A protein has these predicted regions:
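Long, low-complexity intrinsically disordered regions enriched in Ser/Thr/Pro/Gly
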Residues: 44-45, 77-80, 131-135, 139-148, ...
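Blade-terminus and WD-like Trp-Asp/Gly-His loop motifs, strongest in beta-propeller folds
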Residues: 33-41, 81-89, 129-136
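Beta-strand-rich domains and repeat architectures in extracellular enzymes and scaffolds
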Residues: 1-13, 22-37
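Conserved binding-pocket/active-site segment within a compact domain
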Residues: 90-95, 100-142
């Protein structure tokens, strides 16, 4: 079984093999990996650097496979955040470009790679943080008051994801 250790000092992920060997998982600054509810897989975003095209990866702690799940979408949208719903579904924030903090909420089905859009807001309204609890997705975000995107208000919204999953 492989292990992932997040190095907060340089925002890198260290891979510890089943033999205790340590090496960097990749060459980029990454988000802290999140382990699946079953403890067999992990997700992380990389590179997590300003003005970089961020991608979502799935790491299999059993066999060491590291798979890119989502890169840029239509050349303009990319993952900004991801959390586990269960061993089959992820909740994602996918936003516009490299400059936005958040975006719309999606579900990703790991069994068939289906991406399901849950919210459909323009760039002025963005979810920036997701939390999951007992079938409900708690979204925290910002809504800009004008197209200039200088002033904003914070909002919270709760989504019943059972409406979108089996």
């Amino acid at each position: 079984m492989y292990q992932l250790k997040y190095r907060r000092s340089d925002n890198r992920i260290e891979l510890i093999t089943e033999y205790g060997e340590k090496k960097l998982l990749n060459d980029s600054i990454s988000s802290k990996p999140t382990i699946s509810p079953g403890g067999l897989k992990a997700i992380y975003l990389s590179p997590c650097e300003w003005e970089s095209i961020t991608k979502l990866y799935l790491f299999d702690l059993g066999n060491g496979d590291n798979i890119q799940l989502i890169g840029d979408i239509d050349g303009a949208y990319m993952p900004k955040g991801a959390i586990w719903i269960d061993n089959s579904y992820l909740a994602l924030i996918i936003g516009f470009g490299t400059f936005s903090d958040g975006g719309n909420v999606y579900l990703y089905n790991l069994m068939d790679s289906q991406l399901i859009k849950i919210t459909d807001w323009d760039q002025r309204k963005q979810v920036v943080k997701l939390e999951y609890n007992s079938g409900f997705l708690k979204c925290k975000g910002i809504e800009y008051l004008s197209d200039m995107m200088e002033e904003y208000i914070e909002f919270k919204e709760i989504l019943d994801i059972k409406l979108y999953t089996l």
